[in-house]
């Protein structure tokens, strides 16, 4: 009987059929609990080679559309059948397996630079090779690897990566001065306004007054500190060019701050700019516009 049993077993084992049946039986018994997930092969163009013996569902609620949504639009990855390679279209349900930086970032040392900063999954220099990746809890799950293996960071930067332009509150200020002082405040070729902007960082512009044609508006834009410093420089400039009197007064005050001299120096010298035709102060000028305006010095 034993010999006969061996003879009956030979034909099945000669071509490996006996081993195949044993493996299929074992695999089927261990995979019975997997009948809760759809078979990706069945719902693909290639079809499922296992037929009724497949360990995954061939009848899934929602059909192809539901399975396609799960596999292509970020749903949970479907486990492959035991002993087979995982499907290529399975989407990772979290960060990539590598948690350290193993490659150099090819954007770091370029002119445009790397826009991901500390959140980049590549090393910014050899010193970062092997450094753990910075995983932001607010970062959404990546939508699949790029051809280079670089998983996409979140599309929007975090508040900590906001642009420097948003730092510091922006404000505006307006100073009204006599229109005759505008030229002196601007300076030849805009030298004065450029200097104020360069030193304080505030933007400065001189525009017409809304209602009074005898006045000009000096408009300042920047942070509160920038406007404060620029306003102080503008007022010092107005005093230095002899515009210390308020805009309402049409006659200049006797006291002149030019050169720190006493008020008796008013109109005691000829205006050099007037002879060149470039005086911008007009009647407000503290120097004489011609011999007929010359006054004798009080010291004399």
UniProtKB/Swiss-Prot annotation:
Keywords: DNA-binding, Metal-binding, Repeat, RNA-binding, Zinc, Zinc-finger. GO terms for molecular function: DNA binding; mRNA binding; zinc ion binding. Disulfide bonds: none annotated. Residues 170-234 form the KH domain. A zinc finger (C3H1-type) spans 33-61, 99-127, 265-292. It comes from the Eukaryota. One of its GO terms (cellular component) is cytoplasm. GO terms for biological process: regulation of gene expression. Gene3D superfamilies: K Homology domain, type 1, Zinc finger, CCCH-type. InterPro entries: KH_dom, KH_dom_type_1, KH_dom_type_1_sf, ZFP36-like, Znf_CCCH, Znf_CCCH_sf. Residues 1-38, 243-262 are annotated as: Disordered. SUPFAM superfamilies: CCCH zinc finger, Eukaryotic type KH-domain (KH-domain type I). Pfam families: KH_1, zf-CCCH. This is Zinc finger CCCH domain-containing protein 14.
């Amino acid at each position: 009987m034993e010999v006969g049993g061996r003879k009956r077993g030979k034909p099945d084992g000669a071509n490996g059929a006996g081993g195949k049946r044993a493996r299929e039986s074992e695999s089927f018994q261990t995979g019975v609990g997997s009948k809760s997930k759809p078979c990706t092969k069945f719902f693909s163009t290639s079809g499922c080679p296992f037929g009724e013996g497949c360990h995954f569902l061939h009848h899934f609620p929602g059909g192809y559309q539901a399975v396609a949504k799960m596999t292509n639009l970020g749903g949970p990855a479907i486990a492959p059948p035991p002993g087979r390679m995982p499907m290529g279209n399975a989407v990772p349900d979290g960060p990539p397996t590598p948690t350290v930086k193993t490659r150099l970032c090819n954007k770091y040392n370029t002119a445009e630079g790397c826009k991901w900063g500390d959140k980049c999954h590549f090393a910014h220099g050899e010193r970062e090779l092997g450094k753990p990746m910075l995983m932001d809890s607010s970062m959404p799950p990546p939508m699949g690897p790029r051809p280079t293996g670089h998983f996409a960071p979140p599309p929007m930067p975090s508040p900590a990566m906001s642009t420097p332009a948003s730092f510091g509150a922006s404000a505006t200020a307006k100073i009204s001065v006599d229109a005759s002082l505008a030229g002196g405040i601007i300076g030849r070729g805009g030298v004065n306004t450029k200097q104020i902007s360069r030193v304080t960082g505030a933007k400065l512009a001189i525009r017409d007054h809304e209602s009074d044609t005898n006045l000009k508006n000096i408009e300042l834009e920047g942070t509160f500190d920038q406007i404060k410093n620029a306003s102080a420089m503008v007022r010092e400039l107005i005093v230095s060019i002899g515009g210390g009197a308020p805009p309402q007064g049409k006659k200049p005050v006797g006291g002149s701050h030019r050169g720190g001299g006493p008020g008796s120096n008013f109109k005691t010298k000829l205006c050099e700019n007037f002879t060149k035709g470039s005086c911008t102060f007009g009647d407000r000028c503290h120097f004489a516009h011609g011999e007929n305006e010359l006054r004798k010095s009080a010291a004399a």
